[in-house]
């Protein structure tokens, strides 16, 4: 890996923090042991790959020194002190003024309960009252961007590519509004939606709800990309995997299904509860999933191999919402209670979440923090990006809880910038549109896209098999040469266009399918006109003036 300088190879410096950047499969035996390889050219190539790998690991470890910010957690002064007993009032009095001011507490008792959703960069907050109150605001500056009183039931809302547009799931249809609250679109295809989400790299608005259908809508072109029937009744919970954009749906029979817009059937189905699934959360890396059900259970899954890490049975009350922060903190709401755990996503048995101090056992993962909304009920919760805050929407308003260590201390401003200007936001929108991924690229393993199919060599026919296939076809043609071809006078209805539309991909709506449907309608109109001419209803030179005027827009 090193460069030759003055006849010597430059040594690669090993870093103290290099271990956390090395692959787990890169063992000591694989580092330098290439003596068993007899091919000199292959051995030299393997050594070169090893040197490049060492250089990459050393460079990654060196850049870690340039990230001085670190996560700060609550630390007890002695073994008898428990962090979950610390109240929010004590934390506010101890932190700096700017952090204390971010502990938002809005009292909105008239239109609750409230559903909250933060923008991807954490700058804006979108609140949705069940009784029709919708508002978008810059919560850090205290500026209200848009406020709507829709006078009908609203269930959920989400921002689209940025805070300039947001979608609201209302009583029957889903609507899209701009940053001033002006209605832009009414999506008639999305009926009785209860859950909304947006895939930023594919520009897809995803909805699910009472109808049992999962629908993908491309907001850049306005086309309905796909509509999938879940066959599991109303959707109880929905979450997206940020790593591969696969949607996770929770159903009333206790199953969690994973969906891609290009597949009519779920990619994976797993049983997560003995009752309805109330909430689903997936961590930022896309490795772990947390679910909670009406059977008073909470389970944590490793979705790389779909194995269960931890299972907490017999919660005091059924969990209603679950969320995972960028740093791996797990938050659970049950009634008026909100409980958080640290290190709950680790594999060790000591990481299993539990309640209380468990008799002072130091090898138990007791709650990291807890909060009680007395006489209230939590509607939903979500961590604020890049902030040590947990947003909670409840029956009487919105509250931000200060949770030390919840936010990512070092962020990539080229990806998500919480301090972006108007010009940067516009450039970012253009950049994401140019780099928009097709809906067909959503799969369980995104690394498989562009790779070589190793099975193709075994599936491909060799020269001998091709010759035999050609010979069999010629012999069959000679044998049936005396059979005349039957050509009926009436054209059958089983045309190529109809057979294309009858394929199993009825749920996929693309440009080709729209062109085929348009061609079928055109042929149908021609046959209808010829029939009317034959019956003497119209003349051959008859022209429909209105139809010709509107045909230019077809």
UniProtKB/Swiss-Prot annotation:
GO terms of biological process kind: endonucleolytic cleavage in 5'-ETS of tricistronic rRNA transcript (SSU-rRNA, 5.8S rRNA, LSU-rRNA); endonucleolytic cleavage in ITS1 to separate SSU-rRNA from 5.8S rRNA and LSU-rRNA from tricistronic rRNA transcript (SSU-rRNA, 5.8S rRNA, LSU-rRNA); endonucleolytic cleavage to generate mature 5'-end of SSU-rRNA from (SSU-rRNA, 5.8S rRNA, LSU-rRNA); maturation of SSU-rRNA; maturation of SSU-rRNA from tricistronic rRNA transcript (SSU-rRNA, 5.8S rRNA, LSU-rRNA)
Cross-referenced InterPro entries: BING4_C_dom (IPR012952), WD40/YVTN_repeat-like_dom_sf (IPR015943), WD40_repeat_CS (IPR019775), WD40_repeat_dom_sf (IPR036322), WD40_rpt (IPR001680), WDR46/Utp7 (IPR040315)
Annotated keywords: Nucleus, Repeat, Ribonucleoprotein, Ribosome biogenesis, rRNA processing, WD repeat
Comp. bias (Polar residues): 24-35
WD repeat residue intervals: 108-149, 230-269, 272-311, 314-351
Domain of life from the UniProt record: Eukaryota
PROSITE patterns associated with the record: WD_REPEATS_1, WD_REPEATS_2, WD_REPEATS_REGION
UniProt feature, compositional bias: Basic residues: 1-12
Pfam families per record: BING4CT, WD40
Renumbered residue ranges of the record's region Disordered: 1-39, 475-496
The keyword Repeat belongs to this UniProt entry's keyword annotation: yes
SUPFAM superfamilies tied to this protein: WD40 repeat-like
SMART domains xrefs: BING4CT, WD40
One CC-aspect GO term: preribosome, small subunit precursor
Compositional bias ranges of the Basic and acidic residues kind: 13-23
Keyword Nucleus included in the entry's annotation: yes
The protein's role, per its UniProt record: Involved in nucleolar processing of pre-18S ribosomal RNA.
More about this protein: Present with 5800 molecules/cell in log phase SD medium.
Record text on subunit structure and interactions: Interacts with snoRNA U3. Interacts with MPP10. Component of the ribosomal small subunit (SSU) processome composed of at least 40 protein subunits and snoRNA U3.
Protein name in the entry: U3 small nucleolar RNA-associated protein 7
Native organism: Saccharomyces cerevisiae (strain ATCC 204508 / S288c) (Baker's yeast)
């Amino acid at each position: 890996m090193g460069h030759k300088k003055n006849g010597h190879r430059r040594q690669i410096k090993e870093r103290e923090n290099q271990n956390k950047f090395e692959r787990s499969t890169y063992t000591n035996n694989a580092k330098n042991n290439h003596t068993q390889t007899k091919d000199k050219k292959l051995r030299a190539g393997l050594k070169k790959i090893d040197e490049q790998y060492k250089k990459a690991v050393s460079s990654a470890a060196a850049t870690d020194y340039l990230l001085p910010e670190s996560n700060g957690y609550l630390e007890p002064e002695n073994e008898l002190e428990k962090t979950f007993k610390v109240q929010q009032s004590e934390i506010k009095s101890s932190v700096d003024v700017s952090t204390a001011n971010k502990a938002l507490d809005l009292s909105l008792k008239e239109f609750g309960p409230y559903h909250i959703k933060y923008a991807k960069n954490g700058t804006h907050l979108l609140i949705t009252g069940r009784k029709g109150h919708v508002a978008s605001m810059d919560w850090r500056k205290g500026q209200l961007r848009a406020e709507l009183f829709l006078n009908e039931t609203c269930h959920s809302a989400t921002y689209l590519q940025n805070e300039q547009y947001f979608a609201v799931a209302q009583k029957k249809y889903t609507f899209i509004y701009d940053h001033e609250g002006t209605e832009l679109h009414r999506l008639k295809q999305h009926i009785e939606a209860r859950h909304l989400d947006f895939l930023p790299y594919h520009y897809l608005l995803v909805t699910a709800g009472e109808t049992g259908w999962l629908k993908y809508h491309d907001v850049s072109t306005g086309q309905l990309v796909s509509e999938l029937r879940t066959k599991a009744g109303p959707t109880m919970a929905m979450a997206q995997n940020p790593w591969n954009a696969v949607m996770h749906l929770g159903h009333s029979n206790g199953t969690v299904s994973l969906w891609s817009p290009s597949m009519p059937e779920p990619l994976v189905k797993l049983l997560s509860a003995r009752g309805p699934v109330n909430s689903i959360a997936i961590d930022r890396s896309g490795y772990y999933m947390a679910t909670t059900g009406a059977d008073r259970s909470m389970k944590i899954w490793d979705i790389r191999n779909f194995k269960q890490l931890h299972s907490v049975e017999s919660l005091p009350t059924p969990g209603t919402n679950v969320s995972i922060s960028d740093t791996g903190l797990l938050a659970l709401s049950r009634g008026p209670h909100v409980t958080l755990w640290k290190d709950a996503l680790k594999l060790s048995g000591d990481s299993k979440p539990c309640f209380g101090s468990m008799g002072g056992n130091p090898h138990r993962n007791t709650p990291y923090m807890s909060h009680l909304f007395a006489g209230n009920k939590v509607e939903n919760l979500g961590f604020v990006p890049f902030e040590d805050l947990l947003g909670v929407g409840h029956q009487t308003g919105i509250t931000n809880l200060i949770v030390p260590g919840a936010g990512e201390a070092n962020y990539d401003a080229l990806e998500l910038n919480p301090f972006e200007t108007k010009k940067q936001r516009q450039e970012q929108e253009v950049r994401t549109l140019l780099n928009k991924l097709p809906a067909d690229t959503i799969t369980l393993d995104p690394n498989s896209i562009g790779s070589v199919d190793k099975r193709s060599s075994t599936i491909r026919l060799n020269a001998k098999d091709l010759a035999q296939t050609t010979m069999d076809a010629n012999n069959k043609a000679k044998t049936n040469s005396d059979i005349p071809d039957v050509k009926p006078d009436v054209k059958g209805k089983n045309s190529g266009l109809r057979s294309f539309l009858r394929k199993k991909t009825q749920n996929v709506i693309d440009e080709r399918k729209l062109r085929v449907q348009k061609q079928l309608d055109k042929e149908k109109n021609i046959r209808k006109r010829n029939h009317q001419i034959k019956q003497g209803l119209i003349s051959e030179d008859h022209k429909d003036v209105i139809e010709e005027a509107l045909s230019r827009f077809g």
